[in-house]
């Protein structure tokens, strides 16, 4: 259908009071299938001002998401959508806009220059537009996958949501360019696992670990650290659940929070309450790294399986806890107070199993490096069959949650389980991973790991903005590739990671010298980062390094909780032999789509259907 287009002068004359009144009285103008009976369990603010709020629920049976978008201060329209990394270009969008006479709701997309186009396949279905005391509420749905090349495939991992505010009418959807709008992005996991809530113990108690009335700095990013401690003589307990406590009014400010337990070998830790990067922060706080709880925007309460709990308190456990809160304050608001934190639910009735946390992936070492100017360079770390055979109990372990972690150049992380040389299943995968959005995620399905299994963790990096090689290490400009898996029963195996054998890396430096006129320093006193810094990064040297990581022996770290390796020969270990890999997931098209509209849905001023 052709959308009517009044003249520019007519549109301008209609703008103002008429547009505002028209959009405010938009009440139930559209009729469609009713939303599911279940409420909207997930809710996030989209913009820092809190004028846009998104709620949603997930139907795995229908493979559909129902969205509810609340627009508190509607001007001339709004756009919402998804893109690969949060760009407004090449985005999958749904737009509510007005031309001055009528309003339209339509599935759209933006091109590489930010111009918006109506999608020929209308996959966003508007179910209801309703004025509420809070603002205009838009209820619509969309399948996970549509098989429309202009649409975003909604997957299990991180989704980069984008939004835009239309402040004036547009005579046509094609007249809108995202660069002229007030826009932004928000990261979230849309496809939350449908995990049933386990029974909770009758003697359950709570403990709140909260920031003590923090005056949030008026800068875009702040990591705030606060040290607290358990009561004297606090006995051993099991954490069975935790949930966020966000100060009312700060929902758009608190991005993520973590509670760490400090190292038991220190009898005391100094008190601290301030920015984590402060020069006044005691260095001993760097030994508070054992994660007890982690929450990120959009996440709900985290439950441990009925048969397991995370132990804390008692002998051999530190009394000291560190709370870390990430404040995201792009508007640089001054004077805001915050007492957000995490509420721990714990029981003195210990469950059958202690839960454990194991590190998978790559060792923090500069021998694993990413050349500069790479768009998708892959590094892989192994937890080998030799290590799991030695360190896991005969009945194996059961992974129920996972937290992926890289530094700034990480773009994708996946861990797969292999058995008898064949990849069997994915433990966790995030194809749109962002280092700015990290949370402990419940797995849809518990993954059982048997002695002799292999766990393979691969990270994909983008270093297009780097001039030198990015080496592995603890620094924020260095890189990591880690999956912290949460499992039960707890074992002595705390770290199962690898890195290329250092001797073979030196052979790489000597080898590329033959083709580069001794440009790479291989002198004994040169460090590995210094050697990488002198490599001329032509295509040959890049390919050889990638090939080296794909065949060279590895140094295996099969470590106990005491940071001591299990007994055995762990150097110059061959890479696990994988004879069969999992196929890449194939998007599923909706079985029956029904009749989608040929164009946008039109709503006239009187509330009738267009």
From Swiss-Prot:
Organ and tissue specificity: Detected in adrenal medulla chromaffin cells.
GO annotation terms (biological process): dopamine catabolic process; norepinephrine biosynthetic process; octopamine biosynthetic process
A Pfam family of this chain: Cu2_monooxygen
Keywords per UniProt: Catecholamine biosynthesis, Copper, Cytoplasmic vesicle, Disulfide bond, Glycoprotein, Membrane, Metal-binding, Monooxygenase, Oxidoreductase, Secreted, Signal-anchor, Transmembrane, Transmembrane helix, Vitamin C
This protein's pathway: Catecholamine biosynthesis; (R)-noradrenaline biosynthesis; (R)-noradrenaline from dopamine: step 1/1
Group of enzyme by EC: oxidoreductase
Cross-referenced SUPFAM superfamilies: PHM/PNGase F (SSF49742)
Region (Disordered): 586-610
InterPro entries with a match to the protein in the record: Cu2_ascorb_mOase-like_C, Cu2_ascorb_mOase_CS-1, Cu2_ascorb_mOase_CS-2, Cu2_ascorb_mOase_N, Cu2_ascorb_mOase_N_sf, Cu2_monoox_C, DBH-like, DOH_DOMON
TM ranges: 10-30
Disulfide bonds: 147-589, 225-276, 262-288, 383-496, 387-558, 459-481
Subcellular location: Cytoplasmic vesicle, Secretory vesicle membrane; Cytoplasmic vesicle, Secretory vesicle, Chromaffin granule membrane
UniProt PTM: Proteolytic cleavage after the membrane-anchor leads to the release of the soluble form.
Active site: 223, 405
Gene3D superfamilies xref list: 2.60.120.230, Copper type II, ascorbate-dependent monooxygenase, N-terminal domain
Listed EC numbers: 1.14.17.1
Positions of the DOMON domain: 50-166
Glycosites: 57, 177, 194
Annotated site, Cleavage, chain positions: 32-33
UniProt topology in membrane: Single-pass type II membrane protein
Main subcellular location: membrane
Reactions the enzyme catalyzes: dopamine + 2 L-ascorbate + O2 = (R)-noradrenaline + 2 monodehydro-L-ascorbate radical + H2O
Residue intervals on the Intragranular side: 31-610
Family: Belongs to the copper type II ascorbate-dependent monooxygenase family.
Self-association and partners: Homotetramer; composed of two disulfide-linked dimers.
Name of protein: Dopamine beta-hydroxylase
Gene that this polypeptide is encoded by: DBH
């Amino acid at each position: 259908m052709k959308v009517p287009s009044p003249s520019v002068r007519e549109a301008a004359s209609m703008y103002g009071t008429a547009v505002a009144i028209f959009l405010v009285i938009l009440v139930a103008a559209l009729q469609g299938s009713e939303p599911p009976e279940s409420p909207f369990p997930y809710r996030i603010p989209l913009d820092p001002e809190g004028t846009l709020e998104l709620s949603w629920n997930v139907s795995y049976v229908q493979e559909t998401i129902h969205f509810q978008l609340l627009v508190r201060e509607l001007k001339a329209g709004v756009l919402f959508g998804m893109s690969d990394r949060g760009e407004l270009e090449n985005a999958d969008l749904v737009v509510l806009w007005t031309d001055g006479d009528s309003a339209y709701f339509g599935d759209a997309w933006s091109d590489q220059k930010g111009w918006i186009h109506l999608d020929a396949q209308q996959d966003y279905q508007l179910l209801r537009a309703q004025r509420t005391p809070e603002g205009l509420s838009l209820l619509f749905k969309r399948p996970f996958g549509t098989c429309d090349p202009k649409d975003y495939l909604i997957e299990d991992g991180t989704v980069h949501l984008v939004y835009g505010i239309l402040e004036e009418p547009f005579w046509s959807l094609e007249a809108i360019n995202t660069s002229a709008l007030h826009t932004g992005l928000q990261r979230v996991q849309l496809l939350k696992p449908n995990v049933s809530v386990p029974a909770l113990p009758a003697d359950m108690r709570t403990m709140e670990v909260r920031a003590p009335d923090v005056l949030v700095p008026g800068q875009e990013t702040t990591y705030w650290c606060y040290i607290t401690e358990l009561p004297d003589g606090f006995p051993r307990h099991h954490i069975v659940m935790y949930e966020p406590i966000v100060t009312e009014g700060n929902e758009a400010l608190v991005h993520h929070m973590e509670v760490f337990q400090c190292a038991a070998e220190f009898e005391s830790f100094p008190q601290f309450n301030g920015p984590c990067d402060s020069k006044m922060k005691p260095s001993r706080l760097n030994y508070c790294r054992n994660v007890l709880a982690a929450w990120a925007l959009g996440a709900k309460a985290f439950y441990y399986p009925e048969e397991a709990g995370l132990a804390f308190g008692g002998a051999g456990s530190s009394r000291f806890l560190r709370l870390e809160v990430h404040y995201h304050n792009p508007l640089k608001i001054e004077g805001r107070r915050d007492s957000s934190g995490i509420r721990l639910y714990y029981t003195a009735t210990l469950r059958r199993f202690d839960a454990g946390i194991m590190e998978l992936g790559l060792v923090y070492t500069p021998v694993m490096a990413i050349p500069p100017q790479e768009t998708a360079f892959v590094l892989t770390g192994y937890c080998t069959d030799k290590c799991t055979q030695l360190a896991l109990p005969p009945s194996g372990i059961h992974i129920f949650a996972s937290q992926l972690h890289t530094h700034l150049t990480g773009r994708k992380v996946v861990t797969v389980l292999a058995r008898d040389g064949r990849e069997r299943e994915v433990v966790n995968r995030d194809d749109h991973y962002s280092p700015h959005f990290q949370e402990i995620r419940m797995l849809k399905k518990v993954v059982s790991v048997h002695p002799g299994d292999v766990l393979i963790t691969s990270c994909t990096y983008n270093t297009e903005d780097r001039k030198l090689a990015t080496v592995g290490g603890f620094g924020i400009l260095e890189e990591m590739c880690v999956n912290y898996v949460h499992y039960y029963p707890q074992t002595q195996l705390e770290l199962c990671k690898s890195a290329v054998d250092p001797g073979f890396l030196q052979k790489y430096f000597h080898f590329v010298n033959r083709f580069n006129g001794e440009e790479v320093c291989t002198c004994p006193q040169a460090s590995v980062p210094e050697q990488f810094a002198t490599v001329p990064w032509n295509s040959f040297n890049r390919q050889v390094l990638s090939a080296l990581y794909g065949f060279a022996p590895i140094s295996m770290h099969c470590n106990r909780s005491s940071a001591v390796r299990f007994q055995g020969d762990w150097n110059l270990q061959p890479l696990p032999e994988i004879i069969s890999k999992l196929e890449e997931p194939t998007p599923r098209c909706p079985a029956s789509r029904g009749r989608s509209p040929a164009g946008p849905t039109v709503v006239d001023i009187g509330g009738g259907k267009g």
